[in-house]
UniProtKB/Swiss-Prot annotation:
Protein name: UPF0132 membrane protein MJ1527
Family matches, as Pfam families: DUF4870
Membrane-spanning ranges: 40-60, 70-90, 92-112
Species this protein is from: Methanocaldococcus jannaschii (strain ATCC 43067 / DSM 2661 / JAL-1 / JCM 10045 / NBRC 100440) (Methanococcus jannaschii)
InterPro entries associated with the record: DUF4870 (IPR019109)
């Protein structure tokens, strides 16, 4: 294959990915400006995994319910994504462990959105306690 062709495909993929991210972030900011129900804002904290958690932490200053879910989303998904990336470098076992971590991420993602929609302040194991401890002070 031609290196030029490979680099063109790679650049187009990254441009598409960056454009998609910017549209999604813009969409989230506009949704927050609409004055949504706090349960829906809690769900949106989990929508883009740790990215939406960080966005809601930066934009929401008052509501403890939303800040808790945003912090929990940010800490949980960023940590698990980093762990999955690091573990995947281990031959054979790393692939299995990384797959299991990614399955756990999807399960926590669904549970987090359901609990937030129901208005519950559900704490994930380990990460929920950390979020509970720090969500009030983070960037206030």
């Amino acid at each position: 294959m031609n290196i030029y062709l490979i680099s063109k495909v790679f650049i187009k993929y990254h441009l598409f990915q960056n454009i998609l991210k910017s549209y999604l972030l813009n969409f989230l900011v506009r949704l927050m400006a609409l004055g949504l129900d706090r349960n829906m804002e809690g769900v949106l904290c989990y929508l883009l995994f740790w990215i939406s958690g960080l966005i809601f932490l930066l934009l929401e200053r008052e509501d403890d319910f939303i800040r808790f879910h945003a912090m929990q989303s940010f800490i949980t998904f960023l940590s698990l994504n980093l762990i999955a990336i690091i573990v995947s470098a281990i031959p054979i076992i790393g692939w299995v462990a990384s797959t299991l971590i990614n399955i756990a991420i999807i399960i926590l993602w669904i549970v987090g959105m359901i609990k937030a929609y129901n208005g519950e302040r559900y704490k994930f194991p380990v990460f929920g306690d950390i979020a509970e401890r720090y969500y009030r002070e983070f960037l206030k």
